[in-house]
From Swiss-Prot:
Subunit structure of this chain's protein: Monomer.
Lineage, top ranks: Bacteria, Bacillati, Bacillota, Bacilli, Lactobacillales
Name of this chain's protein: Glutamate--tRNA ligase
Subcellular location: Cytoplasm
Membership in a protein family: Belongs to the class-I aminoacyl-tRNA synthetase family. Glutamate--tRNA ligase type 1 subfamily.
SUPFAM superfamilies documented for this protein: An anticodon-binding domain of class I aminoacyl-tRNA synthetases, Nucleotidylyl transferase
Species assigned in the record: Enterococcus faecalis (strain ATCC 700802 / V583)
């Protein structure tokens, strides 16, 4: 097998999106599984759309997820530069070669002329395409246009009536007709920068990329890239186009404009998701190993990764499943580490002072331990722990309705008396007090525990009742009870 070299090639036009993170992650797993190399290349030819720190943000978030790369702008190998904007001197001789072999030509059509042509074609019911207006200009005609101040783009001369086939790792054989790709396409813009399809094909060849794994929104680009390979008599890489990611609730393609779902890695970082959990979750977006297991370490995923198991169906992004996976990892965390993760959120909400005392940290450890089994992400500690920081939790309608039960006043008065009598306020004593209430009132089960839980915590469900009351403290627990009574 050819040495595996794959690349993740982001454009610095925004932050790291879930879909782009998946592309990077599958390339990373494929490279590591095959003892290959994982390359970062920055595709920044669209200078107008690039944002400040876009490259830095993307790479920082990839590193946070746990990916390491073998070559990049900051760690160049022998195939640099690794930013397309720095490779113009590499592209230009190849553009000139296509011009001299008549595989490309200068086009002087203005944007206004092209738009008018497109509208006329649509009015005739034709698929928009470049009509070849400048395809056969004589040198004197070209000189006249340049004398008039027109600057050309360079168009690639698309072969007519030609079929292009490739075997896609995910989708099998794919065929394109050259007459259906929109006519001769631009490979160099007026500012001298190459277009995406030209630069990608050249870079993949010169950087010895063996496999190109990317989203299936790139399928339409593949025939254009194959034509460029053909023009230079180069062997193309193996292509694999991963299915789209859809919103599991709407069934629609994940769109950056859909604000009902968080879609950028840094948003999950800010909420206190764990990188290992994110890596695990993203790896299952459009790929699955044999079996039913869903929790995997990075080492497991590298060992198990098989590109033949990439899904042919759209991958459903399920935020609830991500919360579940993150919870599985959080439950296994060292308590001190998890507490350190949670404290900044409590500080930011004004619930805890900065640099809390050792005594306060011990109390916070108990608080975090109480909610660790159910916590989906670190920032959730603020919402989960409301009852410890508010005067009294607000009851919802279901809780209020339950407190209308016939035996509720009896249970709560008895429990209040039991708590007031306690000299030692710890979990065994609190559990003994609840048992004493059961014996005294004859009420048991849900009718015993639920009123106590609602009165003390304001919630119908939650962590262990004894531990909750102990951490709340005798004074506050009695205060909550009195407010309900």
């Amino acid at each position: 097998m050819t040495k595996v070299r794959v690349r993740y090639a982001p454009s610095p036009t925004g932050h790291l999106h879930i879909g782009n993170a998946r592309t990077a992650l599958f390339n990373y797993l494929f490279a590591r599984h095959n003892d290959g190399e994982f390359i970062i290349r920055i595709e920044d030819t669209d200078q107008k759309r690039n944002i400040e720190d876009g490259e830095k943000s993307q790479l920082e978030n990839l590193a946070w997820l746990g990916m390491e790369w073998d070559e990049s702008p900051a760690h160049p190998g022998e195939y640099g530069p690794y930013r397309q904007s720095e490779r113009k001197e590499i592209y230009q001789p190849l553009i000139d070669q296509l011009l001299s072999s008549n595989r490309a030509y200068k086009c002087y059509c203005t944007p206004e002329e092209l738009e008018a042509e497109r509208e006329a074609q649509q009015a005739r019911g034709e698929m928009p395409h470049y009509a070849g207006t400048c395809a056969n200009l004589t040198p004197s005609e070209q000189a006249a246009k340049e004398a008039a101040g027109l600057e050309p783009v360079i168009r690639f001369r698309v072969p007519r009536n030609t079929e292009y086939k490739f075997d896609d790792i995910v989708k099998g054989e794919i065929t394109f007709e050259s007459d259906n790709i929109g006519g001769d396409f631009v490979i160099q813009k007026r500012d001298g920068m190459p277009t995406y399809n030209f630069a990608v094909a050249v870079d993949d060849h010169l950087m010895k990329i063996s496999h190109v794994l990317r989203g299936d929104d790139h399928i339409a680009n593949t025939p254009k890239q194959l034509m460029i390979y053909e023009a230079f008599e180069w062997t193309p890489p193996v292509f694999g186009h991963m299915t789209l990611i859809i919103n599991s609730e709407t069934g629609k393609k994940l769109s950056k404009r859909d604000e009902t779902i968080l879609q950028f890695i840094e948003q999950y970082r800010e909420l206190g998701y764990l990188p290992e959990a994110m890596f695990n979750f993203i790896a299952l977006l459009g790929w699955s190993p044999v079996g039913e297991e869903e929790i995997f370490s990075q080492e497991d995923l590298i060992k198990l990764f098989d590109e033949q198991r990439l899904s042919k169906s759209p991958a459903a992004f399920d935020a609830k499943k991500l919360e579940w996976i993150n919870n599985q990892y959080m439950k296994q965390m060292d308590l001190s580490e998890l507490t350190d993760m949670c404290i900044p959120y409590l500080v930011a909400d004004g619930r805890v002072e900065e640099n809390p005392s050792p005594e306060k940290i011990e109390w916070l450890k108990q608080l975090v331990s109480l909610y660790q089994p159910q916590m989906s992400y670190a920032a959730e500690i603020v919402e989960l722990s409301n009852l410890f920081f508010n005067e009294h939790p607000v009851l919802d309608d279901a809780a209020k309705e339950f407190l209308q039960g016939e035996t509720v006043p009896t249970v709560l008065h008895a429990f209040k008396e039991q708590l007031e009598a306690l000299d030692v306020f710890d979990v065994p004593s609190i559990k003994a007090a609840i048992k004493a209430v059961q014996k005294e009132t004859g009420v048991k089960g849900k009718n015993l525990f639920m009123p106590i839980r609602i009165a003390v915590s304001g919630q119908m469900h939650g962590p262990e009742l004894g531990e909750t009351i102990e951490l709340l403290g005798k004074e506050k627990a009695l205060d909550h009870l009195n407010k309900v009574l």
